[in-house]
Amino acid sequence: DVCSSDLFTRLIADGTTEFDRVRAGYEGPLYAEISPRTFSILVRTGDRLSQLRLRKGNPAPSDAALRDLHQRVPLVHGGDTSANIDGGVGISIDLAGTGPEALLGYRAKHHADLIDLSKIGHYDPREFWEPIHAHGDSRTLILNPDDFYILVSRERVSVPPDFAAELVPYDPLVGEFRVHYAGFFDPGFGYAGVEGQGTKAVLEVRSHDVPFVLEHGQVVGRLVYERL
């Protein structure tokens, strides 16, 4: 969705010491901390800003079980990629570009108009986003501090119907950038059975404080699968 609103929300419950956590047996109100980053946002009662996931036990399979699942139902597709499984499936960045214009993705414009979340399909994405194209054979992209980008994964991935998945940070030590703003993948994402071709993951990316250089094929996150 090229009209991503770049809206950061966190769940708060009474008596808790962490964001986005609700203790077992909790009964009471829930609150949302809402922080628009790039665009000014208009919200109304009933707008959906967060997704709640309920977990019981440890639904994440081991790496061995994930490799076995990949053998039976491919999780990663593409002749130039293979399943990098270590604490989840490694997700790398595609900076080769697609189409005749070698499109890499989009960067959010500054000082754009207000976004009314109730007006679905109303806005022209070009009013909020500028395209980024590959230049020559460098296959690198310099992230400007605190700019917001939409890029895609090099891998085409699948989530079987009896699984869900979440994109988590690869390693905080590799740099001050974040790629998992839109981190949840629903059951059946990119899935069409054994013969499926998968779908590229859309990555919402921001660098913090300092410029950061991304290179084509650099691992930026891991897709952690959870059995339903």
Model-derived regions: residue spans:
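DUTPase catalytic domain/fold
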Residues: 1-228
